[in-house]
């Protein structure tokens, strides 16, 4: 289990779709000798918007629902990982990140409900008080806003319902020609 980190919580990043292919492996390298570079879904989305679609950073940032400087940092991180993998002959696997799976399906307003991620108990949201500042009386865990974004741990169950994003099950899935 990952430790909770101090500081500001990461905001949701909006992506248009989850990746259909989650790992890319260089050919000519023994599978057991390949190192991995782990790239997040939001880094891939930033590269898609800026590099493939040719959007300006400000426009792409609006689509991902992040600030322009944050978009730049996400894009830089993704490009650095891809360059490292290409130069070093490493496998690129795409998994995780704090994302909203599909932007078009997101309701414009979130429900006024705080949810315990451990036991699933719901509490009414108090305007002006972030859900994360309230504690579940049963589990002693911080609450989350219902309908909020998916972090690495929270998305595992929901990803399985939509489309599995993770490491391949077999070597055949690793081969990209």
Curated annotation (Swiss-Prot):
Q: Which organism is it from?
A: Chlorobium chlorochromatii (strain CaD3)
Region ranges (Disordered)? 147-177
Q: Name one Pfam family in it.
A: DUF134
Query: What name has this protein been given in UniProt?
Result: UPF0251 protein Cag_0886
Q: Which family does it belong to?
A: Belongs to the UPF0251 family.
């Amino acid at each position: 289990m990952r430790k909770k980190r101090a500081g500001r919580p990461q905001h949701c990043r909006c992506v248009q779709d989850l990746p259909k292919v989650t790992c890319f492996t260089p050919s000519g390298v023994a599978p057991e000798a390949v190192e991995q570079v782990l790239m997040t879904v939001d880094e891939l989305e930033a590269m898609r918007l800026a590099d493939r679609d040719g959007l300006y950073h400000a426009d792409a940032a609006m689509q991902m629902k992040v600030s322009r400087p944050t978009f730049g940092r996400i894009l830089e991180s993704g490009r650095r990982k891809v360059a490292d993998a290409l130069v070093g002959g490493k496998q690129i696997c795409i998994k995780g990140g704090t994302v909203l799976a599909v932007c078009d399906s997101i309701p414009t307003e979130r429900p006024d409900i705080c949810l315990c991620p451990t036991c699933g108990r719901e509490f009414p949201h108090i305007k002006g008080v972030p859900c994360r500042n309230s504690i579940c009386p049963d589990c002693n865990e911080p609450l989350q806003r219902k309908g909020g974004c998916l972090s690495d741990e929270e998305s595992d169950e929901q990803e399985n319902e939509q489309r599995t994003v993770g490491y391949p099950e077999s070597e055949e899935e690793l081969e990209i020609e």
